[in-house]
A protein has these predicted regions:
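Hydrophobic membrane-insertion alpha-helices, especially the h-region
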Residues: 3-16
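N-terminal export/assembly leader peptides and their processing motifs that target proteins to secretory
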Residues: 14-139
Length: 139
């Protein structure tokens, strides 16, 4: 009976240790992912860099099976979705990454690839602390 109790206790300890390990791994991965996005914050970057970050965010949303709303934009799922918006000097409205993808990355590259932009805002999901939103402005 003591062996049985010790076995159960050992199994419980293994489960707890594995859970803590998984949590630490997840936290480390969030840090790595966030660092990539945060490297753009308050820095001047070219339109070609915007293309790279849009592609990364789009790939992440697809990998995480983020739904697309009726307006054609990804829906915030409160966990791991990400949105990017860009404000151009000559336009009154903000353009979403989905719109740029729909019009064509190549067209964006040829028209805006050499222009400078600055990430002026980053927001995070409350529960997971992952980057959920980035706002770039043409400078």
């Amino acid at each position: 009976i003591i062996i049985c109790i010790l076995s159960i206790f050992l199994i419980i300890i293994c489960i707890v240790v594995y859970g803590v390990y998984q949590k630490n791994e997840n936290t480390a991965q969030i840090g790595v992912d966030n660092k990539t996005y945060e490297s753009y914050e308050n820095k001047e970057v070219l339109g070609t860099d915007i293309i790279s970050i849009i592609n990364k965010a789009t790939d992440s949303n697809k990998k995480n099976d983020i739904k697309i709303g009726e307006d054609g934009n990804y829906i915030d799922n409160g966990k791991n979705s990400i949105r990017i918006e860009i404000k151009f000097l000559e336009l009154d409205k903000v353009i979403t990454m989905e719109r740029i993808n729909n019009v064509g990355i190549e067209k964006f590259w040829s028209n805006y690839g050499a222009l400078s932009f600055k990430c002026t805002k980053i927001e995070y999901h409350e529960k997971t602390h992952r980057v959920k939103y980035m706002y770039f402005e043409e400078v």
